[in-house]
């Protein structure tokens, strides 16, 4: 009998281990699925910031937070205890590294490693927090004091954010030392020539590439020694923004770094409201800029297969008013959703400042309040859609296949200016993109660094290119561009090629090459003979059109882009045989049951765009059911289309300002738990077959919760509104 019991226990143990392994596999799959949404915070869990995304990215290893003394590990555990996956983030160009700068770590002061301007001023991010020239010693500090501790805490995803070197910096002793090591000759002041500027910015680029490569390689190796597979990500602004803000960062090159797993695209109102020129006017164009920013991040990673999170922020760093925040949040939110092959999101940074910060109630008052209930409700409806936002093969409506070429060297020519050549507000980039985008053409971006990937060229029929604001890093990229043209691609090259960076000592004018401009090397590969005049040239199965103007000329003055648009239209119609490009004033995309719309201003068509159907308005905190929605120029819309719900007999929450968990269904009953931050309202629309006979809404203690309810017979949806509770509100509906 004892032998039988032992045998039974052995079998039971084996079964239990097998079940545990299967469960582990299931959990692993669930973990992957449950890293769809995230937010970052330097604070522990609080009831008022319980956002209920999948991942809490815990920021900084410092053993403190605003309201008490907690270790880093304590903060991490506070989120784990509430069911969150936990990741880690810190700055790589700045951070609370006072122990490094003041000599506590290695006995040496390192304040001389800050980024310094021509005037001798250190560029500070905060008190005793300089922007850093990332020396190997600093990299060792990050490895030993940050990365090891994070991995020892059981965290397997590390984000080193914002690898930023200011273009105006480059005068510190630390930078001069790195210059000598990298180039083999003494430092040269960047303001003295375009040549020096180019050399300085290439070095800045290299230093942060090296820093990330060293840190990520170490993280993966140290993780493996602990039996962990550590993933490494870079939260970064877009190439569009860094170029416009005059910051140098590795950007696209990181997408091919072996130790790098992905990015967070840090696009929000603060980046997208940077003014640009179009039709002779300099102004904020938040939606359009955000669309190009997200696009440049998506195209940077798509050929490489790296993961991409898109970020939005319901507010911004600069103190403004709630009305302004709401308007621009809607614009950036819609812009991100118009990229249907990205479905992972950082739903917000810094929830503490969003939920607890005080901001003006309107532009014409100094009165400040915490986030209004109507806005927090709307925001939570929006971010909860991201938990199940589907990938989609659908495309934004409009003419497809037109792309603007970008390169990391966009960041190299921004500051300082030389020989009187200026590119106001990155107009040589926007001059290629905005004339199309503003006419309803969903223009793409293409990264020269990704030219070797065949996937880069998928869906690109017409490539818009200029070297007025950037230069190619190597000649191999030209071979890929030329091969694409010869196979049938259409290249539109726009540029006078007279900016001072054309003649910097680089591969196109050294080692036996003597081209006056890098474009001449490309034209030679394409079989075009000097003097490379404006005109059209047949190349293999493709065509090249040369325009001898700088792209900025299309936008700095009113009406100067019309010939440019005509040329592109003629190429699309007569060379591609694809008809006229479609000129319109709106972008529309369907993603599952979601309708995403943006209507453009500054367009000859000033009519609204009208959608019809059974629609829930997700920008309205009352989430009303509409028969149609009219969207005016300069506005966006985000709608749930009930007509596209696949199984209308299945009881389900369609829209909610809370995270829905623990769903249970039977023939005539639907139950679930809703969780969201304290001091916020929940609104939800629940699809059920018919009007409910009984509804019970209770808190986690079983006490009844006051609720507003109503039945909409046409849509077969039940509206429920109540005060949110992070402990959970139980809802039971019987019909």
Where does each model-flagged region fall?
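Aromatic-lined carbohydrate-recognition surfaces of secreted/lumenal glycan-active proteins
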Residues: 31-41, 87-91, 159-163, 198-247, ...
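Glycine-rich, aromatic-flanked loop segments that form ligand/cofactor-binding clefts
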Residues: 71-125, 157-167, 223-234
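Bacterial Sec-dependent N-terminal signal peptides
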Residues: 1-27
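Catalytic domains of carbohydrate-active enzymes, especially glycoside hydrolases
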Residues: 33-82, 87, 149-157, 258-263, ...
């Amino acid at each position: 009998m004892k032998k039988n019991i032992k045998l039974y226990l052995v079998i039971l143990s084996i079964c239990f281990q097998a079940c545990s392994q299967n469960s582990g596999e299931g959990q692993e799959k669930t973990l992957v699925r449950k890293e769809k949404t995230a937010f970052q915070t330097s604070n522990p869990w609080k009831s008022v910031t319980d956002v209920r995304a999948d991942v809490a990215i815990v920021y900084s290893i410092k053993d403190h937070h605003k309201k008490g003394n907690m270790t880093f590990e304590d903060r991490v555990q506070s989120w784990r205890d509430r069911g969150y996956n936990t990741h880690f983030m810190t700055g790589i160009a700045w951070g609370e590294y006072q122990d490094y700068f003041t000599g506590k770590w290695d006995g040496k002061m390192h304040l001389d490693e800050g980024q310094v301007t021509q005037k001798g001023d250190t560029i500070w991010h905060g008190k005793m927090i300089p922007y850093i020239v990332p020396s190997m010693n600093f990299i060792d500090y990050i490895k030993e004091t940050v990365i090891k501790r994070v991995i020892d805490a059981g965290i397997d995803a590390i984000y080193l954010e914002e690898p930023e070197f200011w273009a105006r910096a480059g005068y510190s002793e630390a930078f001069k030392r790195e210059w000598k090591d990298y180039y083999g000759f003494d430092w040269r002041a960047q303001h003295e020539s375009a040549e020096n500027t180019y050399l300085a910015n290439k070095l800045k680029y290299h230093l942060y590439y090296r820093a990330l490569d060293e840190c990520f390689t170490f993280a993966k190796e140290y993780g493996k020694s602990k039996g962990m597979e550590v993933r490494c990500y870079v939260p970064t602004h877009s190439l569009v923004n860094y170029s416009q803000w005059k910051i140098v960062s590795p950007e696209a090159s990181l997408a091919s770094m072996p130790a790098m797993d992905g990015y967070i695209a840090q696009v929000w109102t603060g980046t997208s409201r940077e003014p640009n020129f179009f039709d002779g006017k300099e102004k904020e164009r938040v939606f359009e800029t955000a669309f190009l920013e997200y696009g440049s991040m998506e195209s940077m990673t798509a050929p490489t297969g790296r993961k991409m999170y898109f970020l939005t922020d319901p507010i911004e760093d600069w103190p403004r008013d709630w009305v302004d925040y709401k308007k621009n949040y809607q614009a950036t939110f819609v812009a991100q959703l118009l990229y249907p092959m990205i479905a992972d999101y950082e739903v917000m940074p810094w929830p503490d400042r969003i939920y607890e910060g005080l901001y003006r109630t309107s532009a014409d008052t100094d009165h400040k309040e915490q986030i209004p209930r109507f806005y927090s409700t709307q925001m939570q409806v929006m971010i909860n859609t991201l938990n199940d936002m589907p990938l989609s093969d659908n495309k934004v409506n409009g003419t497809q296949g037109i792309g603007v070429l970008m390169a990391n060297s966009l960041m190299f020519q921004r500051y300082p200016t030389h020989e009187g050549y200026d590119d106001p507000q990155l107009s040589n980039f926007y001059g290629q993109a905005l004339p199309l985008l503003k006419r309803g053409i969903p223009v793409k971006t293409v990264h020269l660094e990704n030219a070797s990937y065949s996937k880069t060229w998928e869906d690109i029929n017409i490539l818009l290119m200029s070297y007025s604001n950037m230069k190619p890093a190597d000649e191999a990229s030209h071979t890929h561009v030329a091969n694409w043209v010869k196979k049938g691609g259409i290249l539109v090259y726009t540029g006078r090629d007279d900016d001072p960076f054309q003649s910097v000592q680089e591969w196109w004018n050294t080692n036996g090459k003597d081209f006056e401009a890098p474009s001449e090397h490309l034209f030679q590969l394409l079989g075009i003979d000097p003097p490379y005049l404006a005109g059209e040239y047949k190349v293999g199965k493709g065509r090249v059109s040369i325009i001898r103007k700088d792209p900025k000329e299309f936008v700095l003055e009113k009406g100067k882009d019309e010939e440019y648009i005509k040329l592109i239209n003629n190429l699309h119609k007569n060379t591609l045989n694809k008809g006229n490009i479609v000129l319109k004033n709106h972008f529309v995309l369907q993603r599952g049951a979601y309708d995403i719309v943006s209507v453009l201003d500054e367009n000859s068509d000033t009519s609204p765009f009208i959608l019809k159907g059974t629609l829930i308005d997700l920008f309205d905190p009352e989430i009303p059911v509409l028969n149609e929605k009219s969207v005016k120029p300069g506005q966006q819309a985000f709608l749930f289309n009930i007509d596209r719900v696949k199984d209308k007999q299945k009881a389900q929450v369609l829209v909610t300002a809370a995270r829905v968990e623990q769903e249970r269904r039977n023939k005539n009953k639907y139950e679930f738990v809703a969780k969201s931050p304290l001091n916020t309202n929940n609104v939800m629309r629940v699809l059920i077959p018919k009007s409910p006979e009984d509804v019970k809404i209770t808190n986690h203690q079983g006490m009844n919760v006051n609720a507003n309810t109503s039945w909409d017979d046409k849509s077969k949806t039940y509206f429920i509104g109540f005060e949110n509770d992070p402990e959970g509100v139980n809802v039971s509906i019987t019909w």
